[in-house]
């Protein structure tokens, strides 16, 4: 399969330049900020889905936790195809705007529409509501990939400077965390505002989803208009056959490790995120604490800000490893506080945990960009789309499995919406909120011990610089 989308106009494509030239060019601050807004926009809408959709489905929409868990699992099967599909499409896209940028232009509106439909309660039978949930949730999931995968796939094309990539990813993660924090903090109060004081109001959830979707849509257009794909190799200008693209993954162990970490990390994060409201409503007897605790995500910004500094001094691998260990410690402190119903201790544990996850989230995209370079260095094939598309796939797959695990654990514990919960149900909520994330962070930390790219990066980049210079010289001779 080879799909080539060729467009020609007065907007010239960036000239192919030797890597030595690219290394001297820093991305302007205006473009850094515009790029960072992409994750801000994604999180405004999709964090509403990932954080609150299970609660919406069980306590507002009116379907069981077991059905929701199954839905999330089925959606992950679809993700097994949609992530790589969008990656292949990006690798075979050639427009006057570049390879990744146009997807924000093309899919901002469809993503916004389905984001709203997810939080719409139609006047249907229970069976038809389940069908509606499947169509709208899987739809928003697929369209999220269409606007999210380009955020990662464009990074190797924005700059080839590894430190500049860390800076770009850090700013992006800062804004992404800010977006997630904003929606996590204000969602329930806004729902209550539009819903006449109730957080279970269907109209309230619809209005919040609509507002966030429109804001996100406008931001995607801004991101499209203010970013530029400036790093283009001779190879990147050609449509690479799928079979050739897949060669970029052969023996690409850094990619395998990062994809595994992305999967297991987000699995744990999702189980915690989706039961936050449940945990404080039923285990801590105060649902209003959920917004406060979710708002503490802001402290992750401190870790995000200093990530470039720590990565430069102790390496990307060690910085992420430190983050995983902090996240585990935070969870344990939180658990101790919950047993004593001690909110200050829970707050401390949450802050420590968010500091840890701030280090992690800021580096995943950078390490994936490095795996693009590694794939080209090892196999001679540069395929940003297919390599980075698995970032979205693995994260969403982890979140989906996490959602399924959450639903199954709640169901096994005998959770009944809007009722006093049994001891078994409370333990099920605690399992999701505390222990599943600890397992995810621990397995990720173990996987990081096998990540060695930091040590070979100088030689790898020097070899690629020489390779690109030779390819460009040959291309000039053939003109």
From Swiss-Prot:
It is a multi-pass membrane protein. GO terms for biological process: carbohydrate transmembrane transport; sodium ion transport. Disruption phenotype: XylP-xylQ double mutant retains the ability to ferment xylose but is impaired in its ability to ferment isoprimeverose. Coiled coil: none annotated. One of its GO terms (molecular function) is carbohydrate transmembrane transporter activity. It is found in: Cell membrane. Keywords: Cell membrane, Membrane, Sugar transport, Symport, Transmembrane, Transmembrane helix, Transport. GO terms for cellular component: plasma membrane. The keyword Transmembrane applies. Induction: Expression is negatively regulated by XylR and is subject to CcpA-dependent catabolite repression. Involved in the metabolism of isoprimeverose. Transports isoprimeverose into the cell. Transport is driven by the proton motive force generated by malolactic fermentation. Cannot transport D-xylose. This is Isoprimeverose transporter. It comes from Lactiplantibacillus pentosus (Lactobacillus pentosus). The gene is xylP.
